[in-house]
């Protein structure tokens, strides 16, 4: 019923993954496996819902459909065992935009934001772009290649100017589903130090290999009272171009400060198609989601097997969530420039450079495996050939 092996020609769609190759890398002959969207068709139950609305020829001002908030509430309850109330939820115009909004509402220009690199680069760029200092609490790499939070260092780098900690849960690029114990410990620290937590949970519905996502706000009363959770169906159902993000804020005091500000600036009003796509995804998407995740798991196994047999100098870290694979290339013993030259000019691949994710990302590349296996095989063959010439 669902064909994830089908290769889709994305030309003519103005997609970023292909369209930005020339301005970003100076060449457009690269196989793009960088931008975190899928090369799979957006499922038909979403496109059918959008087409049905398009058949009505009037596109004036609209209200949220009646089932918009209930569809979110039911999905979060069924998948994450978290009971969310209607008044906790508001549409936001994108998760990165939401981070910028929170930074502006809850901090002054002389205050600081804590992030834990290597991590999704807008966590640094957005606060810095808004004139806030970003403080690093780098994750610690364990012997197995996975990461853990460094709570001792967190205590050291904290000062009273720190007002927000941005959490990536699940973690990008490491693909980590943080344990309940880790999240509780983080909540205890942030509560005691009066830190507001923004929990980016855009990959929440993409847990893999038996792992489970745990919403930060669900782990304790402390977590619930200091956090804003940002979620979206965009990654899971490949609708990033339809802005469909939302905030979940259990604490009334935080809501009273943030939501009226959103409303005053009309930033909590979803575009026409966002609720339609969200409802379709959350009401009809479970079978597709499971099959998609199974395909992603097989793609990850394919990368692992291929690297082990043909490119042993590159060690993929198996993600516990998401379709992003963190490639450890340090055994190649290449400088940063030489590593980029290997992937771009020799293998003709466009991946995300590990250094863009901050301290700890050196010697890594991020690979998007949400693509037909034939494309993934081609990419690995090109990489194998390039590495063999080192």
PLM feature spans:
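Conserved glycine-rich beta-strand-loop-beta hairpin in the small C-terminal domain of fold type I
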Residues: 279, 295-304, 316-329
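A short helix->loop->beta-strand "cap" motif at the edges of active sites that frequently abuts
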Residues: 111, 132, 192-195, 224-225
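N-terminal small-domain helix-loop-helix segment of the aminotransferase-like
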Residues: 2-96, 101, 281-282, 389-390
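Active-site phosphate-binding strand-loop segment of PLP-dependent enzymes
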Residues: 139-211
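PLP-dependent enzyme catalytic core of the Aspartate aminotransferase-like
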Residues: 155-156, 223, 333-335, 342-351, ...
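Conserved PLP-anchoring active-site segment centered on the Schiff-base-forming lysine
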Residues: 105-127
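Conserved core segment of the aminotransferase class I/II
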Residues: 48, 52, 221, 225-297, ...
């Amino acid at each position: 019923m669902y064909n994830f092996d089908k290769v889709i020609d994305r030309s003519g769609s103005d997609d970023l993954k292909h369209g930005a190759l020339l301005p970003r890398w100076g060449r457009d002959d690269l196989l793009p496996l960088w931008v975190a969207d899928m090369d799979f068709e957006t499922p038909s139950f979403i496109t059918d819902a959008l087409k049905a609305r398009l058949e009505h020829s009037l596109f004036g001002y609209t209200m949220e459909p009646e089932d918009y908030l209930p569809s979110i509430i039911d999905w979060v309850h069924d998948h994450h065992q978290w009971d969310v109330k209607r008044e906790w939820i508001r549409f936001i115009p994108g998760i990165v935009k939401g981070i910028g909004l929170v930074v502006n509402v809850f901090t002054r220009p002389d205050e600081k934001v804590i992030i834990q690199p290597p991590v999704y680069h807008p966590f640094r760029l957005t606060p810095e772009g808004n004139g806030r200092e970003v403080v690093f609490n780098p994750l610690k790499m364990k012997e197995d290649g996975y990461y853990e939070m460094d709570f001792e260092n967190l205590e050291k780098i904290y000062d009273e100017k720190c007002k927000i900690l941005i959490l990536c849960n699940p973690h990008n690029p490491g693909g980590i589903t943080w344990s309940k114990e880790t999240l509780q410990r983080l909540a205890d620290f942030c509560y005691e130090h009066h830190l507001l937590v923004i929990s980016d949970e855009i990959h929440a519905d993409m847990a893999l290999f038996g792992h489970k996502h745990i919403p930060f706000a669900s782990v304790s009363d402390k977590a619930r009272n200091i956090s804003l959770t940002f979620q979206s169906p965009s990654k899971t159902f490949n609708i990033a171009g339809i802005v469909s993000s939302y905030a979940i804020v259990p604490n009334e005091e935080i809501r009273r400060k943030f939501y009226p500000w959103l409303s005053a600036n009309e930033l909590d009003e979803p575009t026409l198609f966002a609720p339609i796509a969200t409802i379709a995804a959350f009401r009809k998407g479970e079978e597709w989601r499971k099959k998609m995740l199974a395909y992603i798991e097989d793609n990850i196994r394919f990368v692992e097997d291929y690297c082990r047999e043909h490119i042993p100098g590159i060690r993929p870290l198996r993600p516990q969530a998401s379709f992003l694979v963190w490639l450890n290339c340090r055994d190649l013993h290449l400088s940063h420039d030489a590593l980029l030259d290997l992937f771009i000019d020799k293998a003709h691949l466009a991946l995300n450079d590990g250094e863009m994710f901050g301290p700890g990302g050196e010697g890594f590349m991020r690979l998007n495996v949400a693509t037909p296996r034939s494309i993934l095989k081609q990419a690995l063959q090109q990489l194998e050939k390039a590495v063999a010439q080192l």
